[in-house]
Amino acid sequence: MEEIEGTNRAAVESCHRVLNLLHRSQQQDHVGFEKNLVSETREAVIRFKRVGSLLSSSVGHARFRRAKKLQSHVSQSLLLDPCQQRTTEVPSSSSQKTPVLRSGFQELSLRQPSDSLTLGTRSFSLNSNAKAPLLQLNQQTMPPSNYPTLFPVQQQQQQQQQQQQQEQQQQQQQQQQQFHERLQAHHLHQQQQLQKHQAELMLRKCNGGISLSFDNSSCTPTMSSTRSFVSSLSIDGSVANIEGKNSFHFGVPSSTDQNSLHSKRKCPLKGDEHGSLKCGSSSRCHCAKKRKHRVRRSIRVPAISNKVADIPPDDYSWRKYGQKPIKGSPYPRGYYKCSSMRGCPARKHVERCLEDPAMLIVTYEAEHNHPKLPSQAITT
């Protein structure tokens, strides 16, 4: 059994060498390639014959029985190259035995009487009696037009697959086109809604009572009120009555007029002269909010203890209302306001000096609106 396996392995290796030579046929010399191919092919045939003889011999209880040759309805002439049929004549006798070796992509046919080798679309004829082996190589391939006649089922399957792919592509294109159309309609609807909303806002503003009509050098706002009296107001304060219209004419004022205008301009939300309504109480007020300028002065005084709450006393009473940590300093900053008199705007904040922790930095803001009260007790 081991002998049969070794002989079979050697025969398969010889067949692989023949296939490698055929694969590298274009890279080698023509004369040397023919000699190597003939010798390797002969060796492969001999080894396969040796395998057949070992299997046919009766060794032990195992016997090798040749199967009857199945008659195929397809003639072998259809599987061969048409050019090969014209050049090579295949003997048809019942006494000839043709063992066939098939690989994954090629068909190898070995015939004993004539020692001929047919491999795919290439045919080789070997003659051992001649002085030099003869090699007939036919490299002509079957034209693509003959393939559909041999495989009609595969052709139909390919056509069906192509039709399915085309239908899928058409469906995808239609879906994409519908999606783009819906997206464009949505954008158009949003734009229309936005324009409608803006038109409503403009209409509300116009119905509020002010409409501006611009000319080259004058701006004429008109009041849409039936009970409004007819007057005309200029920059210098003079009032003139005009029949039929209520208009305010603004010319280009000089620098002195601008200063007087800014000084006399009042907020309409302030109310009466006594200030019953504060200017900043309404969100519709457009008065300029000026930040109060606070005078600050800082002094350094020695600390009276290591506690943060202990601050050196002065002429006023102070109440602590906040504390905040300082970035980069382990000591916080304390905030105090004057408690000597109610409503005093004076403030101060105390922090420990980073260079000298025994000193305190006291910063005063604003001024006291009351005299000093030395008799009061100082509280922190």
Curated annotation (Swiss-Prot):
Calcium is among the record's keywords: no
Compartments where located: Nucleus
Listed GO biological process terms: glucosinolate metabolic process
Keyword ATP-binding part of the UniProt annotation: no
Compositional bias per record (Low complexity), positions renumbered to this chain: 154-178
Record Pfam families: Plant_zn_clust, WRKY
Keywords for the protein's UniProt record, in alphabetical order: DNA-binding, Nucleus, Transcription, Transcription regulation
Assigned GO CC terms: nucleus
Annotation: DNA-binding region: 307-373
Induction: By salicylic acid.
Bias type Polar residues, positions: 84-98, 139-148
One MF term in the entry's GO annotations: calmodulin binding
Region Disordered, residue ranges: 84-107, 139-196
Family: Belongs to the WRKY group II-d family.
Chain's role: Transcription factor. Interacts specifically with the W box (5'-(T)TGAC[CT]-3'), a frequently occurring elicitor-responsive cis-acting element.
Protein name: Probable WRKY transcription factor 21
Provenance organism: Arabidopsis thaliana
Species lineage: Eukaryota, Viridiplantae, Streptophyta, Embryophyta, Tracheophyta
